[in-house]
Design a protein with these regions (language model features):
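Extracytoplasmic/periplasmic, Sec-exported soluble proteins
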Residues: 35-39, 68-71, 141, 145-152
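Short, acidic/polar
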Residues: 32-49, 284-303
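Aromatic-lined substrate-binding rim segments of carbohydrate-active enzymes
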Residues: 39-119, 256-267
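N-terminal carbohydrate-binding accessory modules
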Residues: 1-53
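Short, solvent-exposed turn/loop segments enriched in Gly/Ser/Thr/Pro and often Arg
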Residues: 30, 58-60, 94-101, 178-183, ...
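Polysaccharide-binding and catalytic clefts of secreted carbohydrate-active enzymes
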Residues: 114-298
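Structural preference for beta-strand elements that scaffold enzyme active sites
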Residues: 22-26, 54-56, 87-91, 172-178, ...
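Extracellular/periplasmic catalytic domains that process cell-envelope and extracellular macromolecules
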Residues: 16-19, 48-49, 85-86, 168-171, ...
Length: 304
């Protein structure tokens, strides 16, 4: 039997499980519900009453790697076996570096080492800063430019997928895994650290600039106009004009997420997804207020 996959058929793309079409009648559980197998018993009762055959539920980095290099998959084991015992299926949501553009589910050893695992600054020089219309609450997130954080997240996700293959590679209780959740930052269109300023002033990678210019027809109007009117090479501002900061963030975030996803796929080539915040048009999203997992820049993902 093959693992769950997407197959092209005459009438569209079909999810298959054990080589047969599978329609997910699914619901997503609350963020904390899946932190307890015992609590999930009541959730499964509700799912059964609603006629669901699949649940989407979080598995978080701080749960599986509470100390660096020390992995605990007991909760994952319990959740998978529980679902299997009920004849149901799961889609796992990996809350790693980001959950809703914040780092609340990263392990304590990541969150407390600010030198090694840098924060994404929305105000230069400040690792925590208030956002507009956020009632004065301080905001903090991990930097999408930090190599150490990306590498640590990728290692953890790879170990998760390796364990999942051993646990579930034959039964396929888990149909797919989502990597991160609304990745990026809030409150500004790009990071404001000195490192981010240097990267933003540097030349856009030529393969990426060329890809964007060759896919103009897929873009919303504002992005299309910015690419058409921009330089063919040069800094992010020179190439992408008024949307440069948003595209800069999306470029580095998507590279980061893709690296994490690749680490998992190498261990277990299950279906992998990302979560995008849906907007109709870049002019209708408030740049820097929404998370950068935004469909206004989805054109970039195939090259990254």
């Amino acid at each position: 039997m093959s693992i769950p996959t997407l197959k092209q058929q005459a009438n569209g793309t079909v999810l298959t499980l054990h080589d047969k079409p599978y329609i997910m009648l699914a619901g997503e559980v609350g963020n904390s519900n899946s932190s307890s197998v015992e609590y999930m018993e009541g959730v499964w009762q509700t799912a059964e009453q609603l006629g669901m055959n699949t649940l989407l539920l979080p598995i978080t980095w701080d749960q599986v790697e509470p100390e660096e290099g020390q992995f605990d998959f007991s909760l994952l084991d319990g959740l998978v076996l529980q679902a299997r015992g009920k004849g149901k299926h799961l889609v796992l949501l990996w809350f790693g570096s980001w959950k809703n553009a914040e780092c609340m589910y990263a392990p304590a050893w990541v969150k407390t080492d600010l030198q090694r695992f840098r924060r994404g600054q929305i105000v230069k020089g400040k690792n925590k800063a208030p956002r507009e219309n956020a009632y004065g609450m301080l905001y903090t997130t991990l930097s999408y430019l930090c190599e150490e954080t990306c590498a640590a997240d990728a290692r953890a996700f790879g170990r998760l997928m390796r364990h999942l293959r051993t646990l579930d590679g034959e039964e396929n209780t888990v149909l797919a895994v989502q990597v991160e959740n609304e990745s990026g930052l809030l409150g500004t269109a790009r990071e404001r650290s000195d490192e981010a300023d240097v990267a933003f002033a540097a030349d856009v990678p030529q393969d990426f600039a060329g890809y964007m210019r060759s896919h103009i027809e897929t873009m919303v109007q504002d992005v299309q106009e910015a690419v058409e009117n921009g330089a063919t090479s040069g800094s992010w501002g020179e190439v992408f004009g008024s949307v440069a900061e948003e595209i800069f963030s999306a470029y580095y975030i998507s590279r980061y997420v893709n690296r994490v996803a690749q680490a998992g796929k190498k261990e277990y080539p299950l279906l992998i997804s990302v979560l995008l915040s849906v907007t109709e048009d870049i002019t209708k999203s408030i740049i820097g207020i929404i998370a950068h997992a935004d469909n206004t820049i989805i054109t970039q993902w195939p090259i990254l």
